Every structure is written in C-alpha cells, then in structure tokens.
Amino acid sequence: MSTFTVINPTTAAPVKDIALAGIEETDAIISKAARAFESWRNVTPGDRAKLLRKFASIVDDHNEELAKLEVLNSGHTIGNARWEAGNVRDVLNYYSAAPERLFGRQIPVPNGIDVTFKEPLGVIGVIVPWNFPMPIAGWGFAPALAAGNTVVLKPAEVTPLTAIRLAELALEAGIPDGVFNVIPGKGSVVGERFVTNPLVRKIVFTGSTQVGKEIMRGCSNQVKRLTLELGGKSANIIFSDADIEKAAAGAPGAVFDNAGQDCCARSRLLVQKSIYEKFMGYFERAVKNFKVEDPANESAEMGPLITAAHLARVNEYVPDDAKVAFRGNKPTGPGYWFAPTVLEVNDVNDRTYREEIFGPVVSVITFEDEADAIRIANDSEFGLSGSIWSRDIGRSVRVSRAIEAGNLSVNSNSSVRYWTPFGGYKQSGLGRELGPDALDAFTETKNVFFDTNS
C-alpha cells in the first residue's frame, strides 16, 4: 500500500503520511458496505433517525477539533472551518428527520390499490473535492444514510484528514461498522473503482467539469445513477440603482473567500458602465482591506491556496503583462499565498473571463443595460451561482429568471443553505443536492398494484 504526505498549505510543512488504498482494498470495503446495506436498510426509521441525530451531536461536540484539523490540512480560515464542521452537523440533523418521512403515495386505480415505495439504492460512492472537504462530504453521505443506503467515500488525496475523523465519529455515534466508510486514495484508483464496481449503485461527485464528464461516461456502461456538482464561473451583476457601497463591500468575500477555491465564486464582476468608476473606488478599498493572513488567526478572511502546483496554475492566469486594476495583500514567507487580484477585461473571450481559475482572481467588465448584462452573464458554459444587485424589484425578478444558473442571490452573495436545493445549469452539474428534494436522488420509486378482485 502506497502513502501520501499531507502538506500544510500555510507553511508548506508536512503534516502526516496517509495510506492510500489500492483496487483490492477498495473492492473489499465496497463489498463490506454491500453486506452492511442488507441490515442498515432494515433498521427501523426511528432508530436510523436517532443514530443520525447522535452522529450530528458528536460532530458538534468535536466542532473545534474538526475546524482546527481543516485549518491544518486545507488552509481554511478558522471561522470558515468552524462553519464547515457546523454545516456537517446541520445537514445530519436536517436529514435525520427523513427516515420517518420517506412517504410513498396511494394512487387511485380501478379494481385494486396502487401504492408507491421509496426504496434505497444500495452502496453510494461519494467522491469529495479538496476545496470543501467537510461540508461536501456531508451533503453526500447524510441523505444517503438517511434513505437507508450505505456509503463509501473517497476524500481528495490532498485533504483526507477531516473525512477520516468523521468516519471515526460515526462509529462512536453507533453507526454500524460498514455503513459509512472512508477510503483515502487516488482518483485514478479508488474513484475509478467506484465507477466500475457494479456493487456501487450511484456516484455523487463534486469536482472539475472535465473529470465529471469522464465519470459520466464511465457510469453510462452500467447506467449507474449520478449526481454531479462541477465547475463554475459565476457572475456578480451590479446595476446602477444598487446600493453600490454595499455591493462593493461584499464583492471581495464573494470571490476571494476560501482563496477563490469555490465553484460558486463570483469571479466575473459585471458593473453597469455609468457607475463603474464609483464602484471600483469602493471595491479597491475593500480589496486592500481584505485580511489575507495565517488562517488560524481569528481575524483572517483568506488563507493560502491548497498546493504548490495549484499556486503555479493560478499564477499562469496573471502574467506580468496582465491588465491588473489593483491587488490586495498577502503574507511573505513559506506557504502557497496569492494576493487577491482584480483584472480589467474588455473582451468576453479573454481567458481569465471565460475559464475557471479557482483562485483569488476576479475579472471586471462593464455592461450597458439589463439586456446586455443578461447576455454577458449567460455567455458561459457554466451556470452554478451568481448575484444580482439592484433596488428595482421588477428588474431583480426579470434578471433572476433570465440568468442561466441554479443558485442566485439578490442583494447578497449567498449560495448554500442546507434546507434549499443546490446545483447547476449547463456544464456546472447534474441533479440537485441539499434541501427537501435531494433525498429522491438516493431512492428508487417502486410501484405496486394489489388486485382486490382476486
């Protein structure tokens, strides 16, 4: 069995070595999960709900431990990491109400009774990215477990620590052995085996659009169920009638949060031409005051990028001759630091405007009117999130209906609430996570007719 050295992105120092599973180990754990499914699906709804609530409670008890582990492994700010651990707790609590509410229906038919049942799929393979290791894991495993499935989860190779700890806490909560399994390993080994092993009945994948397409092709061989949350290049649209100062103050966090390593990052900033200079003045002040520092500091608003390789990739998007409007600050010394960077763009075909950089870089472009803003915003292969800033309620409704994105926010930059649906249009994904409808993605509907004339 090979190993991988986890690196602290804040210091570039090694943290610990993690054993990586091979194909044989992966198959063995998948088989274990398949065996556990037969008993887990038959745990009474009330008892399954109690176990999930207990799991949530134990995660809450370990919030600070999990948060500090994420700061160490991922470079997330301590404030964000606490929220992320809390989100796992909240998602578990939310879906703990589901086992007792997996309602079927009684459908009127002649000469009999027709009923439907919501039945679990079996083993669910959850493949988690490195940008939000804890919450995205929870978005997959919580509804899957609530619906009576078992889970095999592959954390990203570079950020496995919190997932491993969550699996330990699940056992502590009384979740039976084999029901929730974490398998550290390479995507080309463990992730690929999730796709090809017929015992895995569904894949939940969050990551790049390119890899998502490969997984989609692989799943087609077995008509394997699939949920995808992929790339984004979200638009932050500022109209002239907006609260300009408020919009500018919120814009840095909308794109630089988590060092821009967020599929929902508003990395395209569309500003109405008549207010461009005024907005940019407020925006520059906000960017220069954005606190990029040791993520363990309570005051930190942004930490480092995840790896040296990713830092090099982001650097490629901002060459020496790039049209930089202004930058924020960054620490000196070790670690994978990149200063918040604002680029002025005049061409929608500019590479920085079209491609997902996945770093603290935002491209600013102007628009003339409402129709122009909609056209520019929709000129993207992605459609995950976005913001609309306007005091005109009619305009806000019109634009929000016209923008091709799955998660929009008016006069704010929010994207995710665990009790509302989350997912993308176009090449940003397939299906929805979170909210009341996500559970349907982890069940099959069975229809049964009873002939009462027999």
Predicted regions span which residues?
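Structural signal for hydrophobic packing residues in well-ordered secondary-structure cores
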Residues: 37, 41, 56-63, 67, ...
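Short loop/turn microsegments at loop-to-beta-strand junctions
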Residues: 1-4, 266, 384
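N-terminal Rossmann-like NAD(P)+-binding subdomain of aldehyde/semialdehyde dehydrogenases
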Residues: 1-112
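Residue-level signal for inorganic ion chemistry
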Residues: 12, 48, 70, 92, ...
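Rossmann-like NAD(P) dinucleotide-binding subdomain of oxidoreductase/dehydrogenase enzymes
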Residues: 104-246, 367
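ALDH superfamily catalytic-core signature
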Residues: 210-347, 410
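Short, well-ordered beta-strand elements within core beta-sheets of diverse protein domains
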Residues: 16-21, 36-42, 126, 236-239, ...
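Conserved C-terminal structural/oligomerization subdomain of aldehyde/semialdehyde dehydrogenase
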Residues: 11-17, 200, 237, 291, ...
